[in-house]
Amino acid sequence: MLQESIKKLVQYGINTGLTPECERIYTTNLLLDVMKEDEYTDPDCDLSDIVLEDVLKDLLDAAVEKGLIEDSVVYRDLFDTRLMNCLMPRPATVQAKFAEEYKKSPQAATDYFFKLSQDSDYIRRYRVKKDKKWTVDTKYGTLDITINLSKPEKDPKAIAAAKNAKQSAYPKCLLCIENEGYAGRANHPARENHRIIPLTMNGSRWGFQYSPYVYYNEHCIVFNGQHTPMKIERATFVKLFDFVKTFPHYFLPSQPAYFSMGPMWPPMWASMMELPLDQVERKVTFMRPEQGTPAPVRGPTPKMTCAFSS
């Protein structure tokens, strides 16, 4: 059963393009090492309908039985991320492929990267599909409601382990560039299957990645290559325009300078979601305080968006 699951996971990597056929044996050996298996007989099994969630569950159950991990969602997530990294191309390969696709079009590049982020299980499709989304018509416009259910609930043992775990300042936060390839620990998620696309915005180094929780359509994160506080200044808007020139099919707002994310410096969030400002239907008048005169602006019948995280 264990060897069948290993073979299926390797085949999944080949089917999705994460792993080239020429690396079948190499990838199999990586997985055997992670699972602490010394023997392999290339089992005869059905490879026609491979469900990633099921294959990973079988491997995780085997890891628990062998005493490799504790049976909790935190340690299972750490371990299956390590398994998926065995299938993954190196960051340089991903960046080169992204650049190749970008020559076709910006959207071709992001389509490739978004698919890779899902195929790698960095974005766990089987959890994201649990999210609830619906719309409600109100007198103020259409209200979009989303309830995020894709973040797993931690069990009490995992919470205690995270509390008692040795504190580390590396990576500095959950969104620093140093997370790429990081194995994780009880109080920090694994990012071995995580890949980042480097960007240059206003002459400075930034990183581009997708959110593992997909709050909105192709929800991505753009973060500073340096762990520095967010500032709202002229350079901020130059960076925003640099991004949307590079990826014109995305929008990119900036977090306010006072916005706090605990130990994380606030990043910028991007998406392909249609926002209320895209729904222009009626005229709205705003006042310019410094002039004391009305400034007519074509605005929308509000389409509101609310997001709740459980």
State the predicted function of each range:
Residues 1-234, 280-304, 308:
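Active-site microenvironments that recognize anionic phosphate/pyrophosphate groups
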Residues 218-219, 224, 256-278:
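Histidine-centered divalent-metal-coordination microenvironment in nucleic-acid enzymes
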Residues 232-249:
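Long, well-ordered alpha-helical scaffolding segments within enzyme catalytic domains
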Residues 248-258:
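A long, hydrophobic alpha-helical segment
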